[in-house]
Design a protein with these regions (language model features):
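Bacterial N-terminal signal peptides
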Residues: 7-16
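Positively charged n-region of N-terminal signal peptides that target proteins for export
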Residues: 1-7
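Boundary at the C-terminal end of the N-terminal hydrophobic targeting segment
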Residues: 19-21
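Amphipathic alpha-helical scaffolding segments comprising HEAT/armadillo-like alpha-solenoid repeats
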Residues: 27-42, 62-74, 94-106
């Protein structure tokens, strides 16, 4: 009887672990789909959508967003959008992204963007 009960408990534990593992997979899958949608949104012409997507990608520290964010930082006409891109690159903190922030300090036409990038760089080195 004890052996039967012990076997039943072990099976229940194994099955419950499998259920939790499948939930994590579903959650990870949802995050990946969300990240994919944000990467699509960052390439649209809609300013609000692009800005929000850039901000969220920085919040989730998406390594896949580094190149699109660098593109925005380098070539966007809107200085607010460039600042959002720089802030997201700072949050992601990849070497390539931080290099782009350093370059913006030197070469961006806007004093405001250069100043914000300098703040992000100084803060990242603390």
């Amino acid at each position: 009887m004890k052996g039967y009960l012990l076997g039943l408990v072990v099976i229940l534990i194994l099955l419950s672990g499998e259920c939790f593992a499948s939930n994590l997979t579903k959650r990870d899958s949802a995050i990946m789909r969300g990240e994919k949608n944000l990467l699509i949104a960052i390439n649209t012409d809609n300013y609000g959508l692009k800005s929000s997507a850039a901000q969220i990608l920085g919040d989730i520290k998406s390594k896949k967003a580094v190149i699109p964010l660098m593109k925005i930082l380098k070539s966007s006409d809107d200085e607010n959008l460039r600042i959002v891109a720089a802030h997201s690159l700072y949050k992601i903190n990849s070497p390539m992204g931080m290099f782009a922030v350093r370059q913006a300090i030197r070469f961006d036409e806007s004093v405001r963007v250069r100043k914000m990038c300098l703040n992000y760089l100084v803060d990242s080195e603390k």
